Amino acid sequence: MTNSQAPMQAAEVRVYPIFTVRWLAVHALAIPSVFFLGSIAAMQFVAR
């Protein structure tokens, strides 16, 4: 009943790139969105 391979053998470790097309797309949308939300929030405190 002995197995030639260890049952809890670690799988190959993959190294993923940080900058991907998805990363660029998310940040291209997220950064201006946060900027505009902050701008709109700041406008609420500007007295006319």
From Swiss-Prot:
Q: How is the cofactor bound?
A: With its partner (PsbE) binds heme. PSII binds additional chlorophylls, carotenoids and specific lipids.
Keyword Iron part of the UniProt annotation:
yes
What InterPro entries is this protein classified in? PSII_cyt_b559_bsu, PSII_cyt_b559_CS, PSII_cyt_b559_N
* Membrane topology, as annotated: Single-pass membrane protein
Q: Which UniProt keywords apply?
A: Electron transport, Heme, Iron, Membrane, Metal-binding, Photosynthesis, Photosystem II, Thylakoid, Transmembrane, Transmembrane helix, Transport
Protein's UniProt name:
Cytochrome b559 subunit beta
Superkingdom to which the source organism belongs: Bacteria
A cellular component term, taken from the record's GO annotations:
plasma membrane-derived thylakoid membrane
Q: Where do the annotations place heme binding?
A: 27
Q: What cofactor does this one take? A: heme b
Give the family per the record. Belongs to the PsbE/PsbF family.
Q: How does it assemble?
A: Heterodimer of an alpha subunit and a beta subunit. PSII is composed of 1 copy each of membrane proteins PsbA, PsbB, PsbC, PsbD, PsbE, PsbF, PsbH, PsbI, PsbJ, PsbK, PsbL, PsbM, PsbT, PsbX, PsbY, Psb30/Ycf12, peripheral proteins PsbO, CyanoQ (PsbQ), PsbU, PsbV and a large number of cofactors. It forms dimeric complexes.
